[in-house]
């Protein structure tokens, strides 16, 4: 739900979120809400629409790149919030996009904390920004480790890593 914005960002008024959730609840649909601030989801876990929703966060690396990620909560904070959501019984997904240089064991641990039903892996799609990207072999190792506990989807823009 939503596009070009993070509906769950700290600066989004609670009334706006409540209006969106109430509106969505009026339809017999399944929803996917995604945020880099999943701790905000925790405030709404008892909203009726959550019974027919999947909650997703982005964990693009376990590392912190201050020039790139300055406004987003740390990856570990996101994973902790998603762990609480999963423990509450709400299905979760993780998107690793744009996937950046990572430490394999640490990233797998963070993603695993989220208990995701699916992980999507994608590359940077903004050509005006250069990001620290992993090698193809590193991504293949990540995919293999993640597949030990969840479904992994490789987005079309990341197929080059799978060759």
Task: Go through the PLM ranges and name each one.
Residues 137-163:
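C-terminal accessory extensions appended to soluble enzyme cores
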Residues 2-145:
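Conserved AdoMet/S-adenosylmethionine-binding subsite of the radical SAM
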């Amino acid at each position: 739900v939503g596009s070009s914005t993070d509906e769950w960002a700290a600066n989004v008024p609670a009334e706006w979120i409540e209006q969106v959730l109430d509106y969505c609840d009026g339809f017999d649909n399944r929803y996917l809400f995604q945020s880099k601030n999943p701790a905000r989801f925790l405030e709404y876990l008892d909203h009726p629409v959550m019974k027919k929703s999947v909650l997703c966060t982005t964990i693009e690396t376990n590392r912190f790149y201050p020039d790139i990620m300055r406004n987003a909560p740390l990856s570990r904070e996101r994973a902790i919030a998603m762990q609480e959501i999963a423990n509450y019984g709400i299905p979760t997904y993780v998107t690793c996009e744009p996937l950046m240089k990572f430490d394999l064991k640490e990233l797998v641990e963070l993603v695993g904390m989220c208990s995701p039903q699916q992980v999507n892996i994608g590359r940077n799609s903004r050509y005006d920004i250069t990001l620290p990207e992993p090698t193809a072999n590193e991504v293949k190792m990540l995919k293999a480790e993640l597949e030990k506990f969840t479904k992994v989807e490789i987005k079309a823009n990341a197929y080059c890593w799978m060759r």
